[in-house]
Amino acid sequence: MITDGTETINSLAKPIKTALAGFNVQICSAEKFAGNDILSADIFFLGCENPSPASFAYLEEMLSHINFASRKCGVFSTSQKSLKYLSGILKDSEAALGETMLSTDGGYQQSDITKWVKELLK
C-alpha cells in the first residue's frame, strides 16, 4: 500500500491493512517507495489526500512503463479529484482498478472498509 504519508490517508490505510488479515501487507510512503516493493504484489492500494503529490512523481513514472494487467488495485482518498488523479495514473499500467473508496470526512467504518476490500479481492 503506497500513500502520500499524510495523517489522514495513513489513518485510512490502517483499517485497510486490518481488512487484509492473512496477507503480507506493508504501508509505505511514496517518498520511501522502491519499484520492487510493488512488483511482486498480487493486489496493491494507492492513497493520497490531494492530487499530484510531489512524492508520487517516481510512482507515476513507473506506472507509465510497467504493465500490471490483471493485478488488482484499490485507490482511496478524501477527495474526488484525488481519486480521479489516482485512477488516471493507473491507466497505462492496465491494473484492474476496483471501485474507489472516498472518505470525505476522514472517518470510516471498519465494516465498510472490509466490505470494500473483499469486493476487490473477488
Task: Briefly describe each language-model feature range.
Residues 10, 15-30, 35-122:
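FMN-binding flavodoxin-like domain, especially the glycine-rich phosphate-binding loop
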